[in-house]
């Protein structure tokens, strides 16, 4: 059963009446451009056909009752009072979004009953949290008929995750969930928020392979990477590493390395990764899948060696995928790191070969069974 059907059904069972409306917000997979978003850089994700559905109805007071179907928990809070953190981690994503919507739209106090469910695997690097934030943001916008654009909802979602949940994420996940386009990957300039859609190449599939090693970005590694990038930006005297050219980096690399080895390595990844994203857009436009595969491999190597966010299980999955796919296509880790998934652009005729090579080898080597998803690029958040 699809999340949107399950949300509608469980809403009726839980509240004893039918939901008025349902919102669906997709997860995302990032083809290339990792950790560049919070450095004001470039990313190239697409929204995927896995996501979060929220069924909801207005109440005649200012209370939100939120039923999390997948874990059978409920949260309740009053929009006429200051919104405080909950002991339930999932509930803070909901409360945080509503809190920052109220900062922008102080008149918003419309109560509601909500039931929500997701088929995005948790802690997989496919943005289950952004799908939750954007679905809640859109729900609030509809409930209050609020004058919020999709980009504004995305930035409110990011604000909630940064300030209320405590993960210093960039804005890519939320922007993709809000603004994704069917059959397109979208290059996002994370400073200007300009979007360049590029069609998914004909004859290719997007495969996502979950290592089933879970990650949790609220822990310190992600935030320390961000601090190291900020150190490097201060060293170069710029607002963000987006503003450092490759030439300027090379000129002062030895000096930065002497001051702070980790900041040097992190900056090397970000500056080279931004360049790879720009080249990837051109490769896709030219249908040059050999070049795109090389860029994806370069991105993975940089995440492994300079940003140091991969783990042995992920590196092994990428190696297997690269062998299976060959030169026409590519594979790399996707998401924040320390587990999660790899993404592959794979010729349609090689999908089963890829699936088989990984099934035959990954569990044997690691003791963990992978999960294989074929995805399509889909539209961003919408009312169903």
From Swiss-Prot:
Record-marked site positions (Transition state stabilizer): 28
Keyword annotations: ATP-binding, Carbohydrate metabolism, Cytoplasm, Galactose metabolism, Kinase, Magnesium, Metal-binding, Nucleotide-binding, Transferase
Gene Ontology annotations of biological process type: galactose metabolic process
Binding residues for ATP: 123-129
Pathway participation: Carbohydrate metabolism; galactose metabolism
Superkingdom of origin: Bacteria
GO CC, alphabetical: cytosol
Catalytic activity: alpha-D-galactose + ATP = alpha-D-galactose 1-phosphate + ADP + H(+)
Any one GO molecular function term: ATP binding
Its EC number(s): 2.7.1.6
Positions with a binding annotation for Mg(2+): 129, 161
Predominant location: cytoplasm
Pfam families according to UniProt: GalKase_gal_bdg (PF10509), GHMP_kinases_C (PF08544), GHMP_kinases_N (PF00288)
Cellular compartments annotated: Cytoplasm
Catalytic center residues: 173 (proton acceptor)
Record: residues binding substrate: 34-37, 222
Function noted in UniProt: Catalyzes the transfer of the gamma-phosphate of ATP to D-galactose to form alpha-D-galactose-1-phosphate (Gal-1-P).
Family: Belongs to the GHMP kinase family. GalK subfamily.
Name the record gives this protein: Galactokinase
Species of the source: Actinobacillus pleuropneumoniae serotype 7 (strain AP76)
Gene this chain is encoded by: galK
């Amino acid at each position: 059963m699809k999340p949107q059907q399950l949300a509608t059904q469980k809403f009726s069972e839980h509240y004893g009446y039918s939901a008025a409306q349902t919102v669906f917000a997709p997860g995302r997979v990032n083809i290339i451009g990792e950790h560049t978003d919070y450095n004001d850089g470039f990313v190239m994700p697409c929204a995927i056909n896995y996501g979060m559905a929220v069924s909801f109805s207005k109440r005649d007071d200012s209370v939100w009752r939120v039923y999390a179907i997948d874990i059978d928990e409920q949260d309740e809070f009053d929009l006429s009072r200051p919104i405080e953190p909950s002991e339930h981690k999932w509930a803070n994503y909901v409360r945080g979004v509503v809190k920052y919507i109220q900062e922008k739209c102080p008149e918003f106090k419309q109560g509601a009953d909500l039931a929500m469910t997701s088929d995005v695997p948790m802690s997989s690097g496919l943005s289950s949290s952004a799908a939750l934030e954007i679905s809640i943001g859109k729900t609030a916008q509809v409930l209050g008929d609020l004058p919020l654009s999709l980009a504004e909802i995305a930035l409110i979602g990011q604000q909630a995750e940064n300030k209320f949940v405590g993960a210093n994420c960039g804005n890519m996940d939320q922007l993709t969930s809000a603004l994704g386009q069917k059959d397109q990957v979208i290059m996002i300039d994370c400073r200007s928020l300009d979007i360049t859609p590029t069609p998914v190449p004909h004859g290719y599939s997007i495969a996502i392979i979950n290592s089933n090693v879970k990650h949790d970005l609220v822990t310190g590694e992600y935030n320390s990477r961000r601090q190291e990038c900020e150190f490097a930006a201060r060293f170069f005297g710029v607002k963000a590493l987006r503003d450092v050219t490759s030439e300027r980096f090379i000129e002062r690399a030895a000096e930065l390395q002497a001051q702070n080895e980790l900041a040097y390595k992190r900056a090397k990844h970000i500056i080279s990764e931004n360049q790879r994203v720009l080249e990837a857009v051109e490769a896709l436009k030219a249908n040059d899948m050999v070049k795109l595969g090389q860029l994806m491999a370069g991105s993975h190597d940089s995440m492994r060696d300079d940003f140091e966010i991969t783990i042995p299980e992920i590196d092994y999955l990428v190696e297997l995928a690269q062998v299976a796919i060959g030169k026409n296509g590519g594979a790399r880790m996707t998401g924040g790191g320390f587990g999660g998934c790899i993404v592959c652009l794979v010729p349609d005729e090689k999908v089963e070969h890829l699936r088989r090579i990984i099934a035959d080898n990954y569990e044997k080597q690691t003791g963990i069974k992978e999960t294989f998803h074929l995805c399509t690029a889909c539209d961003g958040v919408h009312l169903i």
